[in-house]
Amino acid sequence: ETNDQSILKDEDIDIVSIASYDNYHANQIIQAIENGKNVFSEKPLCLTHDEMLQIKKTQKENNNIKISSNLVLRSNSRFLKFKKDFQKGNFGKVFFLEGDYYWGRKKKLFGWRAEMNFYSIILGAAIHMVDLVMWFLDAKPVTVQVMGNDISNMKTKMKYNSFAVILLKFENGVIAKLT
């Protein structure tokens, strides 16, 4: 029995924080839910659509269990103020939002992310901006387009795109461009 399994079986523990490598998150989340633990997980919660469906199914079968993820920009004082001003209409009728997220790319091109069999800058970094815009607009995207490249990481161990541009069109008609 590994240390994480003994933690999950400990009846005195009500909540677990999952901060392992991305490719372990889904399995650990599912095990935690099955063992009656509330979950706070680093993102991404999972790497595949099938993993997402399994997490959703497991949580539905254990609907008293709560799952939360580390979408930290929502608690940043600058964005809390922006959201309040946004809701008051202080920016007029919004038709377009643009955001850039500097995620410390250089350091991550050589760390554990570069050695993974799969790493997504969308799930690991850009998700912060996607979540923030969805939160500001209180709307879901209906159209998503993404283009990326690996030019900046060509001489590194990183095997996947380290840059992406995301275009989102929301149900309320607003368009967002995120990098």
Please report, for each region that a protein language model flagged, where it lies by residue.
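Active-site beta-strand termini and strand-to-loop segments that position acidic
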Residues: K159-N161, I166-N172
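Hydrophobic residues in well-ordered beta-strands that form the structural core
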Residues: S41, L47-T48, I67-S69, E98, ...
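Predominantly a Rossmann-like dinucleotide-binding segment in NAD(P)-dependent oxidoreductases
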Residues: L73-M158
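Rossmann-fold dehydrogenase core element
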Residues: Q54-L73, G92-G99
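Acidic-histidine catalytic/liganding microenvironments
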Residues: D10-E11, N62, N76
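A short helix->loop->beta-strand "cap" motif at the edges of active sites that frequently abuts
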Residues: N35-K37, N62-I65, V174-I175
